[in-house]
């Protein structure tokens, strides 16, 4: 009798464990056939988001969710495209301040020419392989952008930003991390309050501002460069034959150029001003906490 009772308890425990696991983990899936001209809008209270452009005319939505009894995910098609929402329900306002126990990840495939608008309060953003505009905002994670041909506006309050192979005007903001960009052919406007900025192989007009780190920029074509930092060095790499008018000044180090400048003004080795190859678009460099180095691009 005791043996049978023990077996019953074990079986009952397994059933409860399986039931609890099922309740704590579930998924959401939906797909829509779409026409050119629409866009994707995603607005969620919590969750990381990954969006990939495909050679298709479908929007395919998949979400993996933990502790999802308190998250209501919905997706609908309308005249402007597809809208996806994720809303936390059934929790007190105090519980809503801490959503770390809710692990949610959205994975969405869209047509390559489908513009996307993303907003999440609790996760990272990853967007790849689009020939359309991107707008993204997160309060709690990093941002990754790759192979985007179109304008970009993205900001995060809690992570770094990494981007590669961009072709379009790009505006990036972060309050808590570094910004790294490789291979960009559009205008760049980037700003961080808490990290370094690294721009490699970029074209277009460049504006980069940081309050808490160094700035490194390798610029292939000079269409105007504006680099400032309050807490680090500035290193600018330029082609030897580029035309530029350079104005570089530091309050905490030396300003120097390994490229020959004409009409050079040097004030106590902290202020460097001159024309490169006869002059051209202005290059403005300022730092309060480090040296400035202008070097030839190898």
Each model region followed by its residue ranges:
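Intrinsically disordered, low-complexity terminal regions
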Residues: 1-298
């Amino acid at each position: 009798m005791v043996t049978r009772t023990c077996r019953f308890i074990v079986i009952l425990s397994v059933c409860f464990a399986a039931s609890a696991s099922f309740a704590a983990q579930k998924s959401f899936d939906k797909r829509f056939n779409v026409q050119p001209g629409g866009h994707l809008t995603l607005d969620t209270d919590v969750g990381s988001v990954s969006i990939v452009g495909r050679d298709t005319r479908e929007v395919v939505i998949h979400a993996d969710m933990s502790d999802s009894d308190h998250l209501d995910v919905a997706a609908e098609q309308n005249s402007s495209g597809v809208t996806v929402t994720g809303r936390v329900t059934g929790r007190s306002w105090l519980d809503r301040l801490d959503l770390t126990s809710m692990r949610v990840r959205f994975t969405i495939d869209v047509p390559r020419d489908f513009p996307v608008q993303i907003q999440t309060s609790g996760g990272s953003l990853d967007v790849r392989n689009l020939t359309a505009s991107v707008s993204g905002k997160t309060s709690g994670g990093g941002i990754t952008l790759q192979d985007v041909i179109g304008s970009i506006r993205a900001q995060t309050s809690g992570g770094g930003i990494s981007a590669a192979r961009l072709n379009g005007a790009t505006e990036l903001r972060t309050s808590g991390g570094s910004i790294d960009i490789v291979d960009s052919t559009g205008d760049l406007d980037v700003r961080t309050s808490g990290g370094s900025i690294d721009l490699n192989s970029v074209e277009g007009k460049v504006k980069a501002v940081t309050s808490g780190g160094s700035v490194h920029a390798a610029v292939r074509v000079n269409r105007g460069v504006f680099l400032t930092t309050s807490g680090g060095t500035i290193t600018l790499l330029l082609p030897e034959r580029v035309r530029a008018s350079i104005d570089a000044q530091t309050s905490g180090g030396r300003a120097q150029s390994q490229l020959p400048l004409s009409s050079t003004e040097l004030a106590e080795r902290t202020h460097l001003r001159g024309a490169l190859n006869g002059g051209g678009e202005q290059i403005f460099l300022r730092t309060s906490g480090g040296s400035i180095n202008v070097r030839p691009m190898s």
